[in-house]
Regions:
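Short alpha-helical scaffold segments that flank and stabilize functional sites
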Residues: 15, 38, 64, 73-77, ...
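A short N-terminal helical cap/helix-turn-helix that marks the beginning
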Residues: 1-21
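Structural core segment of the AMP-binding/adenylate-forming
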Residues: 48-49, 76-132
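Generic structural signal for beta-strand residues in well-ordered domains
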Residues: 13-15, 50-52, 119
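Conserved AMP-binding/adenylate-forming core of the ANL superfamily
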Residues: 18-64, 68-72, 89-94
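Hydrophobic face of alpha-helices
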Residues: 6, 36-39, 112
Length: 132
């Protein structure tokens, strides 16, 4: 049996399904099962958006549980995660998103509000990190 990163994620989810996996700063806890359900929903979104193996998906927000879940969903789908520090200025974030050709952008609300959307021909889809 080949063991790799995804194997360990799947294995951990299966054996710890009901146990806490992630807790946010407000104290809301997600079990491994919750994480698996969120990942599955994001996989459906990626599929409906036409995302294929190797396509880039950018993430830019403060640390939060949804960031971690989105990151795991991207990797387990076979897409390429493009993590962007939320401390970057809006023009730098736009440049990274444009240069990477990210097809989807997960963005925290404060970051999304600062970006000039018309200067980003891609991404095709933007998801507010707090909303999924």
């Amino acid at each position: 049996m080949e063991e790799n990163f995804l194997y360990y994620i799947e294995h951990s989810i299966r054996i710890h399904w009901e146990e806490p996996a992630l807790t946010d700063y407000q104290g809301q806890t997600h079990t491994f099962g919750d994480v698996a359900h969120h990942i599955a929903r994001l996989h459906l979104l990626f599929e409906e958006s036409g995302i294929r193996r190797g396509d880039k998906i950018a993430l830019c927000s403060r640390n939060q549980t949804n960031w971690g879940i989105a990151f795991l969903a991207i990797l387990s789908y076979g897409a390429v995660a493009v993590p962007i520090l939320h401390e970057f200025k809006a023009d730098n974030i736009r440049h990274i998103v444009n240069h990477s050709e990210a097809r989807i952008l997960f963005a925290g609300t404060p970051i999304w509000e600062e970006l000039q959307k018309e200067e980003m021909p891609k991404p095709e889809t933007v998801i507010k990190m707090e909303d999924y």
